[in-house]
UniProtKB/Swiss-Prot annotation:
SMART domains named among the record's database cross-references: FBG (SM00186)
Binding-site residues for Ca(2+), renumbered to this chain: D270, D272
Site residues, Mediates specificity for sialic acids: Y309
Signal peptide bounds: 1-17
GO molecular function per UniProt: antigen binding; carbohydrate binding; carbohydrate derivative binding; metal ion binding; pattern recognition receptor activity; signaling receptor binding
Cysteine disulfide links: C119-C147, C126-C154, C279-C292
Organism lineage: Eukaryota, Metazoa, Chordata, Craniata, Vertebrata
Domain Fibrinogen C-terminal, first and last residues per copy: 117-335
UniProt protein name: Ficolin-1
Sites where a glycan is attached: N271
Length: 335
C-alpha cells in the first residue's frame, strides 16, 4: 500500500523542482498528469498565464437607473445686456370720475372791480415803478389812462432810470419796413427789437409832460445820446403828428428838431412834404419825414458804414447819412 505513494513522492518532488526552475528561468511549466491507476491521485501543476484572449461580445445594456435627487441651486450668473425697449402698451380704460368738489367762496371783488382797483393803484409808467422801489431794468406791466394793462420795457439804469422804451434796434432780427397798420398796433420781439405802437405812444404822451432820450451805439462800441425836454404823439386822426420840445443836451447832437410837427409816414401812407416822392419808400423806413430826413431810426439795419444813401439807422449830426448804428433806443420819462 505504501509503495505507490513512495513512488509518487519522488515524481512530485521532481515536478516541484522543475516548477521552481521554470519560474527562475522565466518559462512556464506544462500541466502534468501524474498517476493513471485507479488508486492514483491526479495532481495539476499551474502554469504561467498566457496572452489575454479576444474581448467577448458586448453585453446587453442594463436597465436605466432611477432619477437622482435635485442638486442645490447654483449661484446666479452674470447679468446680460439690457434688451431693447418694448412697444408701449395699449391705453387702459379711463378711471372712475371723481366726486364734485365743494363750491368755492365768492371773491370780495368781481373781475371788473378787481381790474378797476389795479388801474387805480397800479403804476402808470416806468417812472412810477421807480418811485415804488423797482430798480431793475426789465419788462413790467403799467396801466394806460383807459385802464388797459400794457407790458413795457423799463430802463432803470440810464440817466437815473424810469424810462419807458418804445423803440429798440439791436440786431436786425425784426423787419421795420412795415405798413401803417403795423406801426399803429406795434410789432417786434420783447427780447430783441420792437416798436411799441403809435396808438400806445399817443396814450402814453397825451397827458402830462414826457421828456425824450435817444441812445445810440456804434459797431465799434462808442455810445452817444440826445435828450429833449418834451415829446408828444397825436392820435391817428392827426396822422400821429410829432410835437417835440427843446433839445437839451447830447453827444449825438440834434437830428430830430427838423421833424417837429410832422405827420408819421409809411410806405403805404405818404404824409411827408416831399412833393410826389414817398420818403418812407425812398429811404426804406417809417418816420416823421419832412423832405426827407435828418434821422431815420426805423431804416434798414446795415453794418455800420454803407454806400447807399440815408437808408440805414441814421442820425445826421452823429455819424451822417452813410453810417448805420448797431443799437438805437428811443425812450420817454414823465418829468
Amino acid at each position: 500500500m505504501w509503495w505507490p505513494m513512495l513512488w509518487a513522492f519522488p515524481v512530485l518532488l521532481c515536478l516541484c523542482s522543475s516548477q521552481a526552475l521554470g519560474q527562475e528561468s522565466g518559462a512556464c511549466p506544462d500541466v502534468k498528469i501524474v498517476g493513471l491507476g485507479a488508486q492514483d491521485k491526479v495532481a495539476v501543476i499551474q502554469s504561467c498565464p498566457s496572452f489575454p484572449g479576444p474581448p467577448g461580445p458586448k453585453g446587453e445594456p442594463g436597465s436605466p437607473a432611477g432619477r437622482g435627487e435635485r442638486g442645490l441651486q447654483g449661484s446666479p450668473g452674470k447679468m446680460g445686456p439690457p434688451g431693447s425697449k418694448g412697444e408701449p402698451g395699449t391705453m387702459g380704460p379711463p378711471g372712475v370720475k371723481g366726486e364734485k368738489g365743494e363750491r368755492g367762496t365768492a371773491s370780495p371783488l368781481g373781475q371788473k372791480e378787481l381790474g378797476d382797483a389795479l388801474c387805480r393803484r397800479g403804476p402808470r409808467s416806468c417812472k412810477d415803478l421807480l418811485t415804488r422801489g423797482i430798480f431793475l431794468t426789465g419788462w413790467y406791466t403799467i396801466y394806460l389812462p383807459d385802464c388797459r394793462p400794457l407790458t413795457v420795457l423799463c430802463d432803470m439804469d440810464v440817466d437815473g432810470g424810469g424810462w419807458t422804451v418804445f423803440q429798440r434796434r439791436v440786431d436786425g432780427s425784426i423787419n421795420f419796413y412795415r405798413d401803417w397798420d403795423s406801426y399803429k398796433r406795434g410789432f417786434g420781439n420783447l427780447g430783441t427789437e420792437f416798436w411799441l405802437g403809435n396808438d400806445y405812444l399817443h396814450l402814453l404822451t397825451a397827458n402830462g409832460n414826457q421828456e425824450l432820450r435817444v441812445d445810440l451805439r456804434e459797431f465799434q462800441g462808442q455810445t452817444s445820446f440826445a435828450k429833449y425836454s418834451s415829446f408828444q404823439v397825436s392820435g391817428e386822426q392827426e396822422k400821429y403828428k410829432l410835437t417835440l420840445g427843446q433839445f437839451l443836451e447830447g453827444t449825438a447832437g440834434d437830428s430830430l428838431t427838423k421833424h417837429n410837427n410832422m405827420a408819421f409816414s409809411t410806405h403805404d401812407q405818404d404824409n411827408d412834404t416831399n412833393g410826389g416822392k414817398n420818403c418812407a419808400a425812398l429811404f426804406h423806413g417809417a418816420w416823421w419825414y419832412h423832405d426827407c430826413h435828418q434821422s431815420n431810426l426805423n431804416g434798414r439795419y446795415l453794418p455800420g458804414s454803407h454806400e447807399s444813401y440815408a437808408d440805414g439807422i441814421n442820425w445826421l449830426s452823429g455819424r451822417g447819412h452813410r453810417y448805420s448804428y448797431k443799437v438805437a433806443e428811443m425812450k420817454i420819462r414823465a418829468s
